[in-house]
From Swiss-Prot:
EC number: 2.7.1.33
Predominant place of localization: cytoplasm
Assigned keywords, A-Z: ATP-binding, Coenzyme A biosynthesis, Cytoplasm, Kinase, Nucleotide-binding, Transferase
Domain of life: Bacteria
Annotated localization: Cytoplasm
NCBIfam families per record: panK_bact (TIGR00554)
GO molecular function, one term: pantothenate kinase activity
Record's protein name: Pantothenate kinase
Source organism of this protein record: Coxiella burnetii (strain Dugway 5J108-111)
Taxonomic classification: Bacteria, Pseudomonadati, Pseudomonadota, Gammaproteobacteria, Legionellales
Encoding gene, per UniProt annotation: coaA
Catalytic activity: (R)-pantothenate + ATP = (R)-4'-phosphopantothenate + ADP + H(+)
C-alpha cells in the first residue's frame, strides 16, 4: 500500500496501484465467465477478466463488507424497536463524465455483487430516466444543455430515492431511450425493495448552496451509502466520446427511427468533427463545471488510462 499526498498536502484518500489493489481480492472466487462478461461490455470499452480480477473483485469484496455491516446495523435497530421495518436498500452512486464508462462499471458491479450470498438482488438505475422530455427541453431552450443539472426533473428523482430509501415497494422508474434520445412516455421499470441499488449519473455528487434552516435543500448524494467516481483525463474522454459516436454512426444510427440517423448522411470525418464539436461545446463544459469539481466527494475514485484500464484506486479513509 502506498499513500502519496499530492503536493505534500494531507489527503483524505489512500492511493493504490493495480497490484496493490488487486491483492485485496484475497480468496474471493471469480464468479464471472467470459460469456458473462461479453454481455456486460460497453460500446467501446472492453473489460477483460484480468480487469475484473484485479480491480472489480476487490471492489465487490469491499462493498460486500460495507453492505453486510449496514444490514447488521439495521437488524440492531429492528431489535431495539422490537419490530421489523421495511427493508432499506444500500444505495451506491456512480458518477463521472459522459463516455467515461459509468454504465460498464455499473453492470460489472451488479453482476459481481449479486453473486454474494447476503445481497443477491441488485438493481441499476440511471438518471437518464429523469431527464425532462425533449419537448419540454425544446420549449425551455435547454436542448443544448441536455445532461446539465437544469435538464433533469430533480424533484421526481429525489422523490424516487426517498421512496426507495424508505423501503417502499414497487417504485416506478421512468425509462429513457438512447435510440430515440428521449423519455419513453408511459414506460417504467419497477424497483421492489432490492438489497442494493446502483444509481448511475453525471451530476449526482453535485451540491449547491444550502437554503435556510427553514428550507433545507436535499441533494441526490444525501441518499448514498457509498459513492464512486470514474475518472480519466479530459482529452482521453474526448477520444472515447468521439469513438463512441462513430461506433453508433456505423451501427444503430443507420436505423431511420434513430434520433441521430441524420448523422449517417455525413462522412466519417464529418461525423467525427460533429462529435468533437458536441464534446467541446456541451460535454466538456458540463464535465468542468458540474462533474469534476465534485470528484473528491466520492468515497472511491477509479482512475483510468487511455486504454480504459484502471491504473489507480483512491479510497477515502473514512
Amino acid at each position: 500500500m502506498t499513500v502519496k499526498p499530492e503536493l505534500n498536502e494531507i489527503t483524505p484518500y489512500l492511493q493504490f496501484n493495480r497490484q496493490e489493489w488487486g491483492n485485496f481480492r484475497k480468496d474471493t472466487p471469480l464468479t464471472l465467465t467470459e460469456s458473462d462478461l461479453d454481455k456486460l461490455q460497453g460500446q467501446i470499452e472492453i473489460v477483460s477478466l484480468k480487469e475484473v480480477t484485479e480491480i472489480y473483485l476487490p471492489l465487490s469484496r469491499l462493498l460486500s463488507f460495507y453492505v453486510t455491516a449496514r444490514q447488521t446495523l439495521q437488524q440492531a435497530t429492528y431489535q431495539f424497536l422490537g419490530k421489523p421495518e421495511p427493508k432499506v436498500p444500500y444505495i451506491i452512486g456512480i458518477a463521472g463524465s459522459v463516455a467515461v464508462g459509468k454504465s460498464t462499471t455499473s453492470r460489472v458491479l451488479k453482476a459481481l455483487l449479486s453473486r454474494w450470498p447476503d445481497h443477491p438482488n441488485v438493481e441499476v438505475i440511471t438518471t437518464d430516466g429523469f431527464l425532462y422530455s425533449n419537448a419540454k427541453l425544446e420549449k425551455q431552450g435547454l436542448m443544448k444543455r441536455k445532461g446539465f443539472p437544469e435538464s433533469y426533473d430533480m424533484p421526481s428523482l429525489l422523490r424516487v430515492l426517498n421512496a426507495i430509501k424508505s423501503g417502499q415497494r414497487n417504485v416506478r422508474i421512468p425509462v429513457y431511450s438512447h435510440h430515440y434520445y428521449d423519455i419513453v412516455r408511459g414506460q417504467y421499470e419497477i424497483v421492489d425493495q432490492p438489497d442494493i441499488v446502483i444509481l448511475e449519473g453525471l451530476n449526482i455528487l453535485q451540491t449547491g448552496v444550502r437554503k435556510t434552516l427553514q428550507q433545507l435543500q436535499v441533494f441526490v448524494s444525501d441518499f448514498f451509502d457509498f459513492s464512486l467516481f470514474v475518472d480519466a483525463q479530459a482529452q482521453v474522454i474526448q477520444k472515447w466520446y468521439i469513438d463512441r459516436v462513430l461506433s453508433f454512426w456505423r451501427t444503430t444510427f443507420k436505423d431511420p427511427h434513430s434520433y441521430f440517423h441524420y448523422l449517417t448522411q455525413m462522412s466519417e470525418t464529418e461525423a467525427a468533427a460533429f462529435a468533437k464539436h458536441v464534446w467541446n461545446e456541451i460535454n466538456k463544459v458540463n464535465l468542468m463545471e458540474n462533474i469534476l469539481p465534485y470528484k473528491n466527494r466520492a468515497q472511491l475514485i477509479l482512475e483510468k488510462a487511455a486504454d480504459h484500464s484502471i491504473q489507480k484506486v483512491y479510497l477515502r479513509k473514512i
